[in-house]
Amino acid sequence: MTAFIPLLRPAAVLLALASAASAALADSRAMPADSMLPAYRQECAACHMAYPPGMLPAASWKRMLSGLDSHYGSDASLDPALVRQIGTWLEAHASTYKRVREQPPQDRITRSVWFERKHHELNAAVWQRTAVGSRANCMACHTHADRGDFDDDRVRIPK
């Protein structure tokens, strides 16, 4: 039995490292705010939170940028060169892992499978509260969302 102990220690270390790496990848939708493309932050956060690009697959971002003249009921048109710059950055940082690979209906983060799974326990009335406003207002409950931090331990649901 003691002959296996030296082999178990490296295996345990590798298992712990793999587990930590897996946990980090599991929440890789988040992106620190200071690593966002300044043009993306400036243009998109002028109207709503600059959502981390990992919340949608590249195809969704591409479609969204191709229809900025009718962006969820608003004209968010930008200079074509700026659209290309933002698009290149969004596509490079878009989600590609299994959890967000599928394209949500109408390219809405709030209609994605992962979003529904993470928020399924919330009563529909929560979304109607004045302090929340809508499912797209991440900052209402995720108080550090503007920093790319969606940790469940920091969620505060307004009353």
Which residues does each PLM region occupy?
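N-terminal secretory signal peptides that target proteins for export/translocation
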Residues: 1-7
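Bacterial N-terminal signal peptides
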Residues: 9-22
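Sequence context surrounding c-type heme c attachment/ligation sites in exported
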Residues: 26-88, 92-159
